[in-house]
Design a protein with these regions (language model features):
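Active-site substrate-recognition segment that forms the wall
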Residues: 1-101
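C-terminal lid/capping helical subdomain adjacent to the catalytic/cofactor pocket in oxidative enzymes
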Residues: 13, 93, 98-146
């Protein structure tokens, strides 16, 4: 049941000088990071598949939040939509194939792929080497959906 989580961001070019570091506005559910391309505003995801168009209402939400927090921003100049493999229970699949002993899975980390990739890789490397992990990997089994 692998699905597609779609994450959005926008840029305000030329205003990266307004912030010296990334800032998260937790009460409004978004963040802003100064980058070479300008201020990058992030903070919205959805399940929307691979073929549906970009959601203008999600972009508008990012724009409104950014302009509320940083008065005087112009119109944004870039909209982006990226895809992340996600499972319905938001847990990745980590483990070996039931059909092939030499096939191991590590996918479905949704928007935490960069964060959890190294940890999952270490677990998989221990599994390949037949080392104990001291972890209960049952919740991450690919068989949980059968």
């Amino acid at each position: 049941p692998l699905d597609t989580e779609r994450g959005y961001h926008i840029h305000f070019k030329g205003f990266e000088h307004l912030l010296s570091r990334p800032v998260v506005f937790a009460n409004r559910g978004f963040g802003i990071t100064p980058m070479e391309q300008g201020l990058r505003v992030v903070g919205t995801v959805e399940f929307g598949g691979l073929k549906n168009p970009l959601s203008k209402s999600r972009i508008k939400n990012l724009v409104n939040n950014a302009k509320y927090m940083l008065d005087g921003l112009p119109e944004h100049n870039d909209e982006w939509l990226g895809f992340r493999p996600t499972l319905p229970d938001f847990l990745p699949v980590i483990g070996n194939s039931k059909n092939y002993k030499n096939v191991f899975y590590s996918f479905g980390h949704h928007h935490l792929g960069w964060t959890l990739g190294a940890i999952s890789g270490k677990i998989i490397s221990k599994m390949i080497s037949n080392e104990k992990t001291n972890l209960d990997l049952q919740p991450y089994s690919s068989l949980r959906f059968t």
